[in-house]
């Protein structure tokens, strides 16, 4: 059985048969990239979300909720309208469309990440790659935006999109969130919700979906203060890293403590390292084995348009290899700067100094005597525009005047003599900055699948069961009368009701032999079966059977809730 056993196929059957998850819209033939969660799957999914939510709250992050549908302006500002695209190629004969980079990789075994549409078209022509569906000729590669487009109301001019990430809902609310945080950096805001990506040809089951759940945190911080105050608590935690250099030289992974990773320059600072450790701890708490987790640094051509550095927490799958489950992206001030520019809103934070500082500032204004006749009524407006410039913009203006002797503002050519330029000293108590952002971004659906895959276990005697982390089991306890006869059934049902009231996810089952029932609950990962047998009416004890060892202990009826809490939750 071991050699022929296909874990993926068995798991797909198990998920459908026992109520974990299955492809959506089955009765209409299904639709790729969409999955429904059944009763058991939805329970595990909620438990994953709960673990992540509780970890975020322990870090002091705030939770919000924002709409899935987002006006187009938001995604123009964020760069998604322009940049959130994948290369696509269409068959000239049958019209089937494929993701071009994936098709080339699957056909030739070469990585074309970062190559242009023209370069991929050339590769397809040179290697005579044909349509996988019909063998027809493929057209030129072009780009396809992955956002689902819609409209707000009955008006075609109010274009909107289903959000491809939850993050933008946080960024556009920054002013209110900063006020809630009392203008004090750093602070973190998260939300857990749906995101949508119109994948070209989603395959691999739950690994690549068009609708999926995310848990994203945006941590706003001062880029000049990147030492995490609690780093000492995690500095000895080990991380398995796969940095860019090792990927390019095929050197494999390295294992370092968080402190070593920072000192050796693999991780940019303790702030970044702290949250990488947080991600690892959450995955472990969900039940992902530590030896199946690594952190891979994305190559520059892989990174999203907003990222200066990204490390992915990847989990190993027997079917799919290393699968990205969580990303930690350094988004710099990209998003807030873009939204400031597009909306005109002030998304800065005032940073107060411990002591006032004397700083040199440029004071630039128009020489009204010189420009008055030239600019006439526009002189006042252009002067106000110059006064509103940042220090950086003023220095750039002066630099250009010094180098070229002139500058054009609103169509007017102005010389150096048209300006009054002074450098003055000022006492300042603080400065306005645009916060930078570090983003831990969790998928929920991939960890769900990988938790099940890594939990699926075959004993030496051929027993197949889910060795899922006990507090992650979709059914925590099964109460089983040995036979369906009084008084065993009444005692069993009363215990079942008691456990329900104590908050356990518990079932009562009296159908089939006790052996079949044990197998039934082993298969779905139920950690403990409580059996009411013929000894129970005599001495008031029951057996608690362990899923993994199949060992049984006898416990008094009144002690069952306490004992189960201890066994399942460690309390």
Curated annotation (Swiss-Prot):
It is found in: Cytoplasm. Its EC number is 6.1.1.14. It comes from the Archaea. GO terms for cellular component: cytoplasm. GO terms for biological process: glycyl-tRNA aminoacylation. ATP binds at residues 197-199, 207-212, 324-325, 443-446. GO terms for molecular function: ATP binding; glycine-tRNA ligase activity; protein dimerization activity. Substrate binds at residues 99, 165, 212-216, 439-443. It catalyses: tRNA(Gly) + glycine + ATP = glycyl-tRNA(Gly) + AMP + diphosphate. Keywords: Aminoacyl-tRNA synthetase, ATP-binding, Cytoplasm, Ligase, Nucleotide-binding, Protein biosynthesis. Its main location: cytoplasm. InterPro entries: aa-tRNA-synt_IIb (IPR002314), aa-tRNA-synth_II (IPR006195), aa-tRNA-synth_II/BPL/LPL (IPR045864), Anticodon-bd (IPR004154), Anticodon-bd_dom_sf (IPR036621), Gly-tRNA_synthase/POLG2 (IPR027031), Gly_tRNA_ligase_arc (IPR022960), GlyRS-like_core (IPR033731). Catalyzes the attachment of glycine to tRNA(Gly). HAMAP family: Gly_tRNA_synth_A. NCBIfam families: glyS_dimeric, PRK04173.1. Belongs to the class-II aminoacyl-tRNA synthetase family. This is Glycine--tRNA ligase. The lineage of its organism: Archaea, Methanobacteriati, Methanobacteriota, Thermococci, Thermococcales. The gene is glyS.
